[in-house]
Amino acid sequence: MNRMSVFLAIWVVSAEAGFAQKVNPLRDSLRVAADSLAYHPDRIDLRLKKASWNIQLEEWNYAKEEYDRVLSKDADNPTALYFRAYVNEKLSRYNFARLDYQHLLYIVPGNFEAQLGLALLNEKDKHFTEAFDGINRLIAQHPDSAVAYAARANMERERKMYEPAEYDYTEALKRVPNNQDYRLSRAYVRIQLRKKEAALSDLDYLVGLGVSKVALKEFYDKLKK
């Protein structure tokens, strides 16, 4: 099935309306940042601010240019390293993204966001052993992190490792019970495992959180088969 198709469909409808309203204010903020930089071209904080607006507008190349300029002046700037890695990943420049995450971890050992970003990048780039090693290490360091457990569960789900994925989604939900994404993901995994009653419980829980039953119809229909 299309990955999280129903959940994303719900999100897209609301996001499209919201994005249309946000574009002009974002453009205005970007224009202000660019005008300020014209008078203060050496201000790193202004370049980081402009790059953040570029990211929100999905202007990946413009954002990368700003981070390149920052890092040419301050090669160890952690904010620029992290977000340039993110932008490089968006541009499918995986090796460059990996180098930025590794550099960030060199100057800030154990940084949660950099470790997570690197593990997810390795998964996307089909470095599966490195990805699992990285996410396992992150969970060992941050056993209370729902995000880390959910990230590992997503990797396991993509590899059709449904039983460990169910375990990890459950661990994530112990920490944030009302997270709709995690609960819908666990319902999907439970359907694959033919745990219909458990999957139904997750779907009903989502309805209790306010998710439309119509939006979950595809999942409910699978339980009838």
Question: Where are the regions that the model predicts?
Answer:
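Structural marker of alpha-solenoid helical repeat scaffolds
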Residues: Y39-H40, K73, I107-V108, Q141, ...
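Terminal, low-structured helical/coil segments at or just beyond the last alpha-helical repeat
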Residues: N24-D28, Q192-K225
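Helix-start (N-cap) detector for alpha-helical repeat units in TPR-like alpha-solenoids
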Residues: I44-D45, P78-T79, F112-E113, A146-V147, ...
